[in-house]
Each structure stands twice: as structure tokens, then as C-alpha cells.
Amino acid sequence: METISIDDLPLDIKIIDILKRRGIRTLNPPQSEAIRKGLLDGKRLLVTSPTASGKTLIAELGMINYLLSKGGKAIYITPLRALTNEKYNTFKDWETLGIKTGMTSGDYDTDDAWLENYDIIVTTYEKLDSLWRHKAKWLNEVSYFVLDEFHYLNDPERGPTVESVAIRAKKRGIVLGLSATISNGKEIANWLNAELVATNWRPVPLKEGIIYPEKKGFVVVYKDNTSRKVYGDDAIIAYTLDIVSKGGQVLVFRSSRKLAENTARKIVQYMNFVKLEDKKLLEIARKIKEVEDAGSNEKEDLYNLVLRGVAYHHAGLSKGLRDIIESSFRDRILKVIVATPTLAAGVNLPARAVVIGDIYRYNRKVVGYMDLIPVMDYKQMSGRAGRPGFDENGEAVVVVRNKREAEKVYERYLMSDVEPIESKLGSESAFYSFLISIIASEGEKTTEELMEYVKETLLPKELAKKYFRSGLDWLLQHDIFAEISDKITLTRFGRRISDLYINPFTAVTIREALEKNEKGCEIAYLHLLAYTPDGPSIGVSRAEEDALIDELNCELFVDEPEDEYEFSNYISALKVAYIVYDWVNEIDEDTILGKYGIGSGDLRAIIDTMDWLTYSGYHVASVLELKDHKDILEELHARVKDGVKPELIELVKIPGIGRVRARLLYQHDIKKPEDIVLNPEKVKQLLGPNLGEKIVREAARTIA
């Protein structure tokens, strides 16, 4: 595949200069092929290629060229918030051309009018869906859509929104899809009305292999029929030490957090034999100790690991800890990260070698049942192998128990194509949300007009019709849709559901519980919200089940279900309710983490979700004019974000004051913003002169 020099591109010289400043002189094969297929002519394209093959630059060239020649706005859409930050920082390069980049994610109940001043907007699929529902006026200026990580169409949770966004995007402008390699790329490209650019080119060649026991050690057998031996008692440790001793970095993937943490602790015991940058590692370890958004135990644990060049990484860690670990690995100071597979789908973090420690993971719905990981997951993990500019080859190895299992794994993962992408709108929850989204963003429709959008989905036609009929009936029956003069429109209740961006089953569950019950205890409200489809899920041990039920001293809004699967959701929601209850009653964070066996990242995720759900519950109660419930939920919402009792609500509204500082001030008779302004010297004495002065100024602004 021929490459193209950037000097030969029909681009503004200022664009060429920025590329040269980045060190780019020649486009790589996927980029060159995208140019040949019409990228700079505004053609719709679906680009499928491996990780780190330069797809982001394809999007940049397409967007910048279009904006400079045609005007308007472009939107770059990702499935993950971490990726929005990464892309936002990359696109800021173009501000010297007068092209401003903005970023938005989360906070679904707003139209983000401030974004009208930006040319490129980086956001998530869910956020764009919510912006369309809010009919943000500036969206009318958007005519170029980049659909990043488009293989997320196949993700059971994110896929429905990706598909819904793609359907509307292709009706509104030019679409550029960027995806990992997929087996039915031609079909998906046709669905997007786009030309396919498909390539398996990688910047660093990948050696794929399998490692299994043989005599006194382990043998690594590669796809190219070469092999080599590594020695030790454990395959992961033996292989990892072999790579690290040669100056490489290793990403080890384990199927659970516990396995990731234990594997990291095992590896670190052998790192004394490896040459490390001790001073830099000590500096990183000290940074970990200083992180404010993490628990003491996890900081201490990681501190000791990082001193020897090893860390673990999973969603249970706080963002502050994850950021330090990621940046230290990028800077090549950390040598080994042991992670759960979520890292493979997130930020760009390549290593010389990838070890896939488990090909099975627990089935979320069937207790005790293990599933083989999809081929796509294997490709995503193995695709992290090889750092451009540092490694001649990347290596990805799968750990298996014996030669017989090696043969099966070889056929399933190393020799197979990834699974074809299929619609994930095939559930009541996903499809009904899709119908709400279309009416909210596109306006009232006849059933025939609405059916035209349904025909645009990737669902088989008969299945789509079935869901359409049942969905329409259910949404009309539950007062979410109304039919007026042959047009389907949103009711007041339906509009609020759409604006809040909650699942319709969540809204109906809340409504039915609140209408049926008088005022309840705080645990009852928190449990109800956590039990909805939008509620956070968390593991509960058998011992915890009994303790949670024994601790319950008030009546819940939801009856205990007999179904085993539903009971697991019910008890998980009860655990979440108690976590949040302790949080809003100002229990110390370390105590909460220890009591419930969760990480600081888990706590933050639970708080963020319950912040949104208490806000949503309060607004649902408001629409239904259920004043008693509304008042309780409104106060709960005010307390959840900062984790405070009712008397501290006014104090934590002041920027710079969190739960600890608010309680300190309250204990010294400073109970509201006015008290801060009237007692500046006392505040400075309690909080220190610099912070105290800042807080006094902020309090004055609050009451102005």
C-alpha cells in the first residue's frame, strides 16, 4: 500500500506546518488510503484498522479541511470520558488556525449553549444523544460527525446509543466512522452510506503467541511457528520478568480486580533482580501518597508496589491514582501494569508485551458461570502490544494450562476474525429508549414516520417491527407518549424522562413506588433508586447479604423478589443504599471503603450515579406533584454530591469547602455563608490564612 507525503496533500500550508511540528512527514498506509478514498473531498468513510494505526489523524485532517473550506462545526464522538480528554488535548493544536475545541460529557439535563462558540466539540455518544433531546440550537451548525471506536456498536450497554446516534448523524451531515478491525466492515459501511477503508497495518509488527508449561519452565509458541523458553514457577511472572529484564514494559490483563492486585503483588517480589530508576519511582510513589481522592489503604498498597516498578489498574481506583499510574507507564518509569480488561478499551497505553492471563470471565447474569471472552476483547488487549518508536515488535501472549488448551485457543483467538457487529437495540429497555430519543430530538411523528427511523436500525426487520409495536403500546400505556391528531408526541412526564436521560423503566419504577407509598426512610429512597435499571451494581457476598438484611430497620418501597437473579439486584441495591447512607451521614471515606470492601473509584462512581438518580427522582416526583416525596428527594440530592448531613448543605455550596472543612467550620459556630463573611479572622484561623481568605471571598460571592 503506497504512502503519501504530506507535501503532496491539497491542504492549507498552515495545516502542513502543524503536521511537521508534530514530526509527521509521510502519511501511513491507512491514512494514505483514506485520502485516496476521498477524505479531503468530504466523502463518508468507515475506517477499520488496528489500535494505534493513526485513525485520529485521519479524523483531524477530515474535520480541519472541512471546517476551513465549508465552515460550520464538527463533532468528535467517543464512548469513554477518558478518551474525550485525550482527544481534546490533541485537537487544541489547531487553535493557531482559529479553530477552537470544546469538550463536554456528563450532566445530561442541559443544552450546553456555551458550545456555540466552538468549532470542534469532543463529547460522548450519550452526551450527544442528550444534547439532541434538549434541542441545543448550536447543533444545527454541525455537519461533520466523527464516530470514534465505532465497534462499540457491538457493546451490550453502549451499543444502543452508538447506533441511535449514528442513525441521526448520517441524516444530518458527513459521517466518518473509526473502528477496530471488524469482520463485517462492508455491511456496516453500506449501512452508514460510506466507503470502507479496511487495513490490518500496524505501526509496530505484532507477534502473537501462547504460553504453557513444558518440562522445567514454560514455552512460548508464536503464530509464525517460532518458539522460546522462559523459566520460573509461574507463567505470567516468568514471561513478565523476561521482557522487563530486556528493557521492555509489560501490560498484564487479569479477569478480576482481585486477580490483578494479587498478580501485581506476586510480580513485585521478583523485581529486585531488575534494574529500575529508583529516584523517579520514589517520586511517583510519593505522588501516590499525596492523592486526595483515594483511600489510605489503596495508596499504601500502591506506594509499596510502585517503588519496585509495578502497579495494578482497575475501575476501583480513584481517577487521581489511575492518572499517575498511566502517565508513569507512558514515561517508561513503571515497568509493569496488571489491569482488568477495561484498560484495553480506554486510554492509549501501549507496552512492548501484553499478557492475557485469563480467557474466561464471570457471566454477570448466571451466578458461578464462566464465559469465554469475545475475539474482539482479545484483539483489543493484544492490540496494545508494541510502542511506536521504542519497540521493533510487539508481543501478545495468552496463558493456558496445557498444550491441548493451547491448540483450542490458537484456533479461537489467533486464527479467527472478530465477531460480526450486530444491533444491540434488541431489548425492550434499549428499544423503548431509542423511540423516546427519536421523538425528543426529531419532534412529533406519525407512526409511519417513526417507523422510517426504526427501519434504519441494524435489527432484523421482523424483530424491529415487533419491538416497535410493543414499544409504542407500552410507552402510550405508561403516559410517556401521547397520540394527538395521528401524531406521536411526548407527554409532560415523557419529556422529563427524556431530559433527565433516564431509562423509561427507571422512571416508571420510581413513579409506581412513590405513588403507592407514603413518605419513607432515607434507605427506602436510596434503595429504590439503586434498584432501577440505571442504578449502580455492586457485588455482595453471602455473609454480607445476611448482615444487610439484619441491619434493615425500616420498610423499603420495593418488595423482596422471589426470583434469584432479581434478588441479587435487590440485595446489590441495598448495599449501594447503605454505602450512600453512610456517605451522606458523614462517615469517614476510609471507613466506608473498608466496611463495604470497595475502592475509592467505586465509591466515586456510586456517588456520581446516585447524585444523578436523586436529582432524577426529585424531578419525577415534582412532575407527578408528589410534594412530600419531592422535598425528601430534593434534600437527599443536595446531600449526596458532597456527603453531608442536612445542616451542612449551605456551607458545601461554597467553592473550596467540602464535607471535612464544612464540619470543622460548623463545629466552631460558623453555620452558613453569612457567618463566614462576618467572621473572616476566625475562618483564617481554622483553615489557614491563604485558604481562609479565598473562602471568605467565595462566601461573599455566594450571598451577593
From Swiss-Prot:
Its cofactor is Mg(2+). Residues 432-644 are annotated as: Required for helicase activity. Residues 366-645 are annotated as: Binds Hjc. CDD domains: DEXHc_archSki2, SF2_C_Ski2. InterPro entries: DEAD/DEAH_box_helicase_dom, Hel308-like_dom4, Hel308_helicase, Hel308_SKI2-like, Helicase_ATP-bd, Helicase_C-like, Helicase_Hel308, HTH_61. Helicase activity is inhibited by Hjc and by PCNA123 and PCNA323. One of its GO terms (biological process) is DNA repair. Keywords: ATP-binding, DNA damage, DNA repair, DNA-binding, Helicase, Hydrolase, Isomerase, Nucleotide-binding. Its EC number is 5.6.2.3, 5.6.2.4. It catalyses: Couples ATP hydrolysis with the unwinding of duplex DNA by translocating in the 3'-5' direction; ATP + H2O = ADP + phosphate + H(+); Couples ATP hydrolysis with the unwinding of duplex DNA at the replication fork by translocating in the 5'-3' direction. This creates two antiparallel DNA single strands (ssDNA). The leading ssDNA polymer is the template for DNA polymerase III holoenzyme which synthesizes a continuous strand. A motif (DEAH box) lies at residues 148-151. Residues 235-439 form the Helicase C-terminal domain. The keyword DNA damage applies. GO terms for molecular function: 3'-5' DNA helicase activity; 5'-3' DNA helicase activity; ATP binding; ATP hydrolysis activity; DNA binding. It is an enzyme of class 5 (isomerase). An ATP, Mg(2+)-dependent DNA 3'-5' and 5'-3' helicase that may be involved in repair of stalled replication forks. Stimulated by both ss and dsDNA. Unwinds both leading and lagging strands in replication fork structures, unlike orthologs in P.furiosus and M.thermautotrophicus which only unwind the lagging strand and only have 3'-5' helicase activity. Preferentially binds dsDNA with overhangs or branched DNA. Able to anneal DNA substrates that could form a replication fork-like structure, has replication fork reversal activity (at least in vitro). DNA-binding occurs via the first 2 N-terminal domains, which are also responsible for ATPase. The central region (432-645) which is structurally composed of 2 domains (432-500 and 501-645) is necessary for helicase activity. Belongs to the helicase family. Hel308 subfamily. This is ATP-dependent DNA helicase Hel308.
